[in-house]
Regions:
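Class I S-adenosyl-L-methionine
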Residues: 1-80, 86-87, 92, 97, ...
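Short amphipathic alpha-helix with an adjacent loop that forms part of the alpha/beta core around
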Residues: 95-108
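Internal, well-ordered alpha/beta segment that forms a basic, Gly-enriched binding/recognition surface
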Residues: 111-126, 145, 151-152, 160-161
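Mobile active-site "lid"/loop adjacent to the S-adenosyl-L-methionine
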Residues: 119-141
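Conserved Class I SAM-dependent methyltransferase catalytic core
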Residues: 140-197, 211
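Flexible, glycine-/basic-rich loop-and-beta segments that form/coincide
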Residues: 204-264
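C-terminal target-recognition/interaction regions appended to catalytic cores
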Residues: 267-392
Length: 392
């Protein structure tokens, strides 16, 4: 069995444990990040609380005082043969969290490293089976990774250098869930890479972060994250969240609430979405009212026409980098060029081709469009592609 990939786990077990074992390039990156903290520091302990097969400790850190913990008995059995068994803990790292549990003195300078599990226990399991995150009450979250971040604060780690989804930071709702962690730690370095570096992840790639945090009583705000300069792995490019305008607050993403209009006056709905990844994965317009359907009206049709255009034509080489963001947009230009997106959608969307001609005429009239059937769709498409390219 390779020390950086647990071949004893089948796909279902990997999903349940949230475990994807780590390529050496990422392990080396973590080691480089923590090196300055290992110099001139006495009484330092390095801890991987979701250690798997020990990849993060074995390469270069075995000479330091360390601890490795994992809940998988087979991984623990393997690690115990490779390391000092007295420093290996086959336990759930999220239960009864305390330094004493891992024989870590209060006075020790604690550096936590690793690739903790991350998955949404409400949605990641197959066949309708729901996951259970067994942890201390103050660590509870539907995502295992968020619970691990909270556990680092409970252990009062001095340094945290781990891999985790970028979405934990760049989605404000997720950031707020970090609670005690964000209030006591500050991001110092962050390098983004694609999930495709991990063996066995799904078809939809998403951004993951090599993150270095220092314990800091001032913590960090979402505005700090919005303006943080993230690097991209093996690239000179940077990612700065505040440089991107999104549809948040401009286009509704979710089905109607109790007091909202429930039925579309033009018989059109748009499938709900969370971010770019879900927008591209899901269908677009639908003709029948549905629990996942957003009500489309004449007045907001152009916004969903823009979404359809974006879904279809936004395909940059590094699309994985933007997948967890809400759809990108230049609101001022979309308001100016409504007709462009409406016309493209009328001509290209298969559902719009099935709808009653009377509805198409209503839409065209509302937006003052001449629906010339001879007009070349490719020229409209190319114009939209140019505009979408300028968003990144």
């Amino acid at each position: 069995m390779l020390i950086d990939y647990a071949e004893h786990l089948n796909k279902a077990e990997i999903i349940k444990l949230g475990s994807y074992y780590t390529p050496q390039i990422l392990v080396d990156k973590v080691h480089n990040y923590i090196q300055p903290y290992l110099k001139n520091k006495k009484n330092t302990i390095i801890f991987d609380s979701a250690g798997g097969c020990g990849a993060f400790i074995t390469r270069g850190l075995k000479d330091y005082d360390y601890r490795i913990a994992d809940k998988d008995p087979q991984a623990c059995s393997f690690v115990s043969k490779q390391f000092n068994a007295e420093k290996v803990y086959c336990v759930n790292s999220l239960e009864n969290v305390d330094r004493k549990k891992f024989s870590i003195p209060k006075s020790s300078f604690l550096i936590i490293i690793g690739n903790p599990p991350y998955n949404d226990t409400t949605s990641e399991f197959k066949s309708g089976e729901k996951g259970v995150n067994i942890c201390d009450d103050d660590l509870k979250d539907r995502d295992l990774g968020v619970s691990f971040l909270k556990s680092y604060n409970k252990l009062k780690a001095d340094i945290v250098c781990i891999l985790h989804p970028l979405s934990y930071l760049i989605k404000e709702a997720n950031f707020k869930r970090l609670k005690g962690f964000k209030d006591n730690y500050k991001l110092i370095k962050g390098e983004i890479f694609s999930s495709e570096l991990f063996k066995g992840t799904g078809k939809i790639k998403f951004p993951i972060l090599v993150a270095l945090y220092e314990r800091n009583s001032d913590g960090m705000t979402f505005d700090y994250i919005r303006n943080f300069r993230f690097n991209l792995l093996n690239s000179n490019k940077e990612f700065i969240l505040s440089h991107y305008e999104t549809t948040d607050g401009y286009i509704n993403k979710y089905p109607p609430r109790k007091n909202d209009i429930q039925k579309s006056p033009i018989g059109l709905y748009y499938w709900t979405f969370r971010d770019i990844n879900s927008l591209k994965k899901n269908t677009s317009f639908i003709l029948n009212k549905h629990v996942n359907g957003i009500v489309v009206t004449l007045e907001n049709f152009y916004k969903y026409a823009y979404l359809y255009s974006f879904k279809t034509l936004f395909n940059p080489d590094e699309i994985w980098l933007y997948g967890n963001l809400s759809p990108l947009i230049d609101i001022r230009k979309v308001e100016r060029d409504k007709k462009l997106y409406v016309l493209y959608t009328i001509k290209n969307n298969p559902v719009l081709k099935e709808i009653k001609p009377m509805i198409i005429r209503k839409i065209a009239k509302f937006y003052n469009i001449e629906n010339n059937k001879r007009e070349d769709v490719s020229s409209i498409e190319n114009e939209i592609k140019k505009r979408l390219k300028k968003l990144i």
